[in-house]
Design a protein with these regions (language model features):
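Processing junctions and N-termini across compartments
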Residues: 36, 78-81, 120
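N-terminal export/targeting leaders of redox proteins
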Residues: 1-34, 54, 70, 94-188
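Short, well-structured alpha-helical interface segments that form or flank functional binding sites
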Residues: 28, 40, 79-82, 172
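N-terminal, post-signal-peptide region of Sec/Tat-exported proteins
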Residues: 42-74
Length: 188
């Protein structure tokens, strides 16, 4: 009986999620979200356990591992090798010099291992993003807030001179996450 009660308590947050949007609207929002999170500007840092940021699909020539022997290791900041902040300084200045190391108003680092998107399918990333165990502990509202407020996300949409970016703005993807969540976060 205790096991049944525990299972019901664990399932309650998903069951309690109000679905105010249609499944079709949620799937359309997910398609727009995936278009953004699968862009190389995002996947080149969302690399998972390899800890090696990439320079893929950005118009710099052949796809390759980030230069300078960068390895994020378990710290995600490269503390055991070349720290990200060796080149990616923390500053609020605009990124105006083409191909210079980008900078933001936060300490440069890779996302947590659980947020690996490089080489993953839409269904895999969808399952990751809807599960707090694999999305850095966020519910839908917290995901949307992260997308609106993260200096990393803001930089990804406006990376500066000579750099490609996904279409839209942080507000666009945050609004789509809210629609997707209101539809029950459907994946297919």
């Amino acid at each position: 009986m205790r096991l049944l009660i525990a299972a019901l308590l664990l399932a309650a947050p998903l069951a309690a999620q109000e679905t105010t949007e249609s499944r079709e609207a949620g799937l359309a929002a997910w398609d727009r979200i995936f278009e953004k999170v699968s862009h190389p500007r995002c996947t080149n840092c969302h690399v998972g356990e390899s800890g090696q940021p990439m320079w893929n699909g950005l118009g710099y020539g052949a796809d390759t591992v980030h230069g300078m022997g960068v390895l994020a290791d378990e710290t995600r900041i490269g503390a055991l090798s070349t720290p990200c902040r060796t080149c990616h300084v923390t500053t609020g200045r605009a990124n105006t010099v083409p191909h210079a190391p980008p900078h933001i108003s936060d300490a440069w680092r890779l996302p947590p291992v659980e947020l690996a998107w490089l080489g993953r399918s839409s269904a895999e990333i969808c399952a990751q993003m809807r599960d707090p165990e694999t999305n850095d502990g966020n519910d839908i509202a917290e995901l949307a807030e992260h997308l609106r407020s993260s200096p990393f996300v803001a930089w990804g949409y406006a990376p500066g001179a000579g750099r490609s970016a996904p279409d839209g703005t942080p507000e666009d993807i945050a609004a789509d996450v809210e629609i997707w969540g209101a539809a029950g976060a459907p994946c297919d």
